[in-house]
Amino acid sequence: MHHHIKALLQSALNIKNTIDIVLERPKNKDLGHFATPLALSLAKIEKTNPKLIAEEIAKILTNYAEFEKVETLNGFVNLTLSTTFLQHIAQKQLQHCMTLEADSINPNISQYTQKTQITPKEHILIEFVSANPTGPLHIGHARGAVYGDALTRVGRFLGYDILTEYYINDAGAQIYMLGLSIFLAGREHILKTQVEYPQSYYKGEYIIDLAKQCALHFGEDVFKSEDSISSLADFGKDMMLQEIKDNLAQVGIKFDSFVSEKSLYDRWQDTLDTLKSHQGIYTKDGKIWIASSQINDEKDRVVVRENGEPTYLAGDIIYHQDKFHRHFEHYINIWGADHHGYIARVKAAIHFLGYDENKLEVLLSQMVSLLKGGQPYKMSKRAGNFILMKDVIEDIGADALRFIFLSKKPDTHLEFDVDELKKEDGSNPIYYINYANARIHTLFNKAGVNMQQTAQNANKLDINEQAKALLFEALCLQQIIESSFRNREIQKICDYLKSLSASFHSFYNTHKILQSPNESSILYVLMIVSQSLTLGLSLLGIKAKTRM
């Protein structure tokens, strides 16, 4: 709809491609569906009175069937779309992105993408979660996980070629510490030997569980010698990675690729040589440093210690060299907010590797504060000082978790009470949206609607003004989707779904629908509303409910 109107304005008014045509939604709905400040922009270029230009634009556009009314106000041109045009857009939307069966509406996202993709879009690599395989996923990981997955779903819907990737941090001190923690837990709980734990060891019942699994796999003698720590670390890492994959599957997340840090380390010398060839590293005090302060970092960083061991940063440098060597057009990393200071040093490394660091976009995900009945959510005994993603899914369900985590910008702090998401009223957004869709399908069932037949006869229907307003709102989803991906603001889809649901509930409560003179036209409009609710939820990774 937005693209059609913009293209019409450009063609009808002979506007150059260099001029941006803006369509705004007026706060006062009486002013029309859209307002454009195009006359103000043209007036600056032509040094002319914007009111005169606006009047000339209105005079031209009045002749087009897309508009029921065209008016001017303070240099703006206000556009009220015709019912015929809205019905035309609705028909296209039904055909492109939904499969209509006699009694149901199903998303057909791949078909939509094929039909609407005009030009090839970017090949993008999105890396997210990438939690160390040293423990279970907590709710901080969960927020970045559902955000990365939803961003991928929306991007693919719009025709972007996206590959999702999980970087496995399976090298370095944290993996050794996992093995040591399992070893000591085995000695204490299986061999019943008194042990002294280091300050930075991994805590929680999951470590004891891993020790018991290691005893079954290797035998109890594995805890008698420190020589087994490496084997215990590898076994524990593999077990935790599988648990992470299982946890992600619970919320519908599956990665296209997993890349092991350990598998990349045989390239470290080649990576150092490349950095050196671009004057990116130097030796000082027995260490090798990357000159990241030259590329917007606050200081240079150590990449190799005095003992010859690479630092944590070295692993990320090798990984990003591997990423950029695969020649994607754009790279998106979704990191925890505590990694904010890491962005500049990684971008500096990309620069010194000979790649364009501006192709890397880093999005940050803030932590989550959870309440239950107004009190802090109980920490997991299994994980120690964390709230596990798995526990919250069991408490409120995957759909509620996905929606609430996507309902705010990821770089803002999120606090919510899980008990609110169990309520069956308007205070629970996912219930409110699903209830709207279920109400619509109840109407379809009572009326015995054949959706295919209703869609085919749409042009014969007489839609009144109230239903037309609801139809217009239901047709705004495409623009919301495009904006949400362009600005990386998936919460816009959540806001739209809540708003559309509220508009439907208001319409439902104030209008007689079944056995009314306008029954057929209203049910057709509600078909479009249901389509938008179903598709919007699908892009968030949530299956819309048709009965509750």
Swiss-Prot record:
One of its GO terms (molecular function) is ATP binding. PROSITE patterns: AA_TRNA_LIGASE_I. It is found in: Cytoplasm. GO terms for biological process: arginyl-tRNA aminoacylation. Its EC number is 6.1.1.19. SMART domains: Arg_tRNA_synt_N (SM01016), DALR_1 (SM00836). It catalyses: tRNA(Arg) + L-arginine + ATP = L-arginyl-tRNA(Arg) + AMP + diphosphate. Gene3D superfamilies: Arginyl tRNA synthetase N-terminal domain, HUPs, Isoleucyl-tRNA Synthetase, Domain 1. A motif ('HIGH' region) lies at residues 131-141. GO terms for cellular component: cytoplasm. Its main location: cytoplasm. Belongs to the class-I aminoacyl-tRNA synthetase family. Monomer. This is Arginine--tRNA ligase. It comes from Helicobacter hepaticus (strain ATCC 51449 / 3B1).
